[in-house]
């Protein structure tokens, strides 16, 4: 028993002088492990008389528990001290200004496209899409555009070969829709289009939204009402809207749509060239030949179509004076639209 008391005293002394958790684990193994000092004492019980074994075994267990309790307490103490030291070294000065997180935002053209789609979705139009690489038939022939039309010239259209090209408008989507389903049809067709043009107000690639409605009894009055309500909803103003006679091969009659200048409210400024009006889109009643090419009876069904440039509307809505700013990827510019 004297040997047992001495082992316990040694173990407790070693624990008290230990300043490291790893060293503490080594002490535990040395005294309480499978081959530890106190474990070896327990194995000597077999050498004692049977009547002494329970008493001595109980004493050994008490000694082991005492050492284990001191080990646990010291481990908790050392871990707490280590945590406190780490927290002191890594503490955060909450009085420092925050760094903040930069948040992204939708591109102004994307915002404009979504706004246009929402305006028409609310009145029953569906969004239709089609390929950007088109064939000559869907881009020109099916839209009543003859071979001598200026739009077919090489300097206006990007051709891959004699039959394939980058679409110059989203009207081919309207043709494909009319070919695949019978009226009533109510669609808007947003997408990228391509033309050989580049200056302050034109880009070789830009976004266009065209609309088509085909049904029985459709009139130009329906077209005017639709366009007027859309423009007032888009700009959130009671704008004056006017329709000027024009010509498009795929509509008859055709019109250009002007709105009261959103910059000067019609008083005349540099943007509207002192006229008080801004051209925003083209429209008209679908030409009977276009309906026939898509196997729709023009005697039974009528339709109207319209088309607008998304960048043009974005420039007017946000007061941007150079179309190319939309494609420069300048974060100083784009950050204004978050």
From Swiss-Prot:
The principal localisation class reads cytoplasm
EC number(s) per entry: 6.1.1.20
Q: Name one GO molecular function term.
A: magnesium ion binding
Q: Which GO terms describe its cellular component?
A: cytoplasm
Please list the residues that bind Mg(2+). Answer: 252
- UniProt cofactor(s): Mg(2+)
Free-text comment on the cofactor? Binds 2 magnesium ions per tetramer.
Q: Please, one GO biological process term?
A: phenylalanyl-tRNA aminoacylation
Where's it found, cell-wise? Cytoplasm
Against NCBIfam families, the record matches this protein to:
pheS
Give the quaternary structure: Tetramer of two alpha and two beta subunits.
Q: What is this protein called?
A: Phenylalanine--tRNA ligase alpha subunit
Per the UniProt entry, what species is this protein from, by scientific name? Pseudomonas aeruginosa (strain ATCC 15692 / DSM 22644 / CIP 104116 / JCM 14847 / LMG 12228 / 1C / PRS 101 / PAO1)
